[in-house]
Swiss-Prot record:
Protein name: L-seryl-tRNA(Sec) selenium transferase
Gene that encodes the chain: selA
Pathway info: Aminoacyl-tRNA biosynthesis; selenocysteinyl-tRNA(Sec) biosynthesis; selenocysteinyl-tRNA(Sec) from L-seryl-tRNA(Sec) (bacterial route): step 1/1
Organism this protein belongs to: Salmonella schwarzengrund (strain CVM19633)
Location(s) in or outside the cell: Cytoplasm
UniProt record similarity statement: Belongs to the SelA family.
Amino acid sequence: MTSETRTLYSQLPAIDRLLHDSAFLSLRDRYGHTQVVDLLRRMLDDARDVIRNTQTLPDWYADWAQEAKLRLENAAQSALRPVINLTGTVLHTNLGRALQAQEAIEAVTQAMRAPVTLEYDLDGAGRGHRDRALATLLCRITGAEDACIVNNNAAAVLLMLAATASGKEVVVSRGELVEIGGAFRIPDVMRQAGCTLHEVGTTNRTHAKDYRQAVNENTGLLMKVHTSNYSIEGFTKTVEEAELAEIGRELDIPVVADLGSGSLVDLSQYGLPKEPMPQQLIAAGVSLVSFSGDKLLGGPQAGIIVGKKAMIAQLQSHPLKRALRADKMTLAALEATLRLYLHPEALAEKLPTLRLLTRSEASIREQAQRLQARLAARYGDEFALEVKPCLSQIGSGSLPVDRLPSAAMTFTPHDGRGSRLEALAARWRTLPVPVIGRIYDGRLWLDMRCLEDESRFMEMMLK
């Protein structure tokens, strides 16, 4: 160690002296003695590293309290930070998918604040079943005999297979062996459930005879998987759920379906692309149908299974059900969301997912033009601001080839340097409420479809 290094080390303050500084007293009141002391030890270690590597004091040496305050504030921020989603993807998996309705938010708050009748029967003063209230709602909406709730649709598929076909073959079309995010693959789930995959047909064409010929003494299920995150077009043939259900009845083999996104309303009435609905499959005779709670349904993350009472009973009694069951906050939010479907006339207004998906291109464009005029003075020296047509996507593997006409505010650097776009996007990500857009074709695009809180957006953009 050089004499210069020793001299610099000697200038570092003692923790005890810092703790008695008035600025640190206020930090101790706010964050606690233990947390502040731990931070000061780390700061001293950092300072020694700087001295050892650069032979200089750290640039924050003159104001330890301010540096400590910044570090404590950053550490206190939640890992789940609110952001402004202007990516153009409404159900953005990385940004938490569906926004919750106000009714769902209030229901969750109530469930957290007080004991609730999660598994308590007020009439009989004994133990109840946590899925009962939601099962009643789901049966009313879908026409099913019974229902089961777990924590996501992947869990729903796993439980469905494990409880009804473990040790048996499950017949699926090759064109429906989907993979979703996180490498969730139907063949892998079957293996985990103890089932044997029996593929039939080809990637683009599967016929009714393929299912019939595949059935043997070890067949447990016939399965349909909705290819919600990709599309096969051209020379294609699939067996519809109603026809497969008829085959199942003829051969006395249950038919189950994984719908993935799972919309509970006919989206075409809102000018959106059609998506198969659970109630249609139930009416067609499918024994069990699984779908997600946090995609097109617009609720919390959950896996929902509706279908025949006897088969739902198998699911409820399986050991996996307890491991996969939903908690009281999920159930509270899902119940409140499902109740909105009982008033379909107000659904597009009250359900955020549907409200955002049904925004007109004209209203989005008007909003973008109005906000662009207010932001021109802030960004106009470096960037050309324009309002351009764009296409939003639904996201989360829902309706993968369909796009929604929208409008975006675009930022193009006057000097044409792409690095300026990267720097601008990075700067927006450091805002107290980060603004998330996308860089494409030499521009930074802010798709306005999902912007509802204009005042917060403008506050962030003008910082």
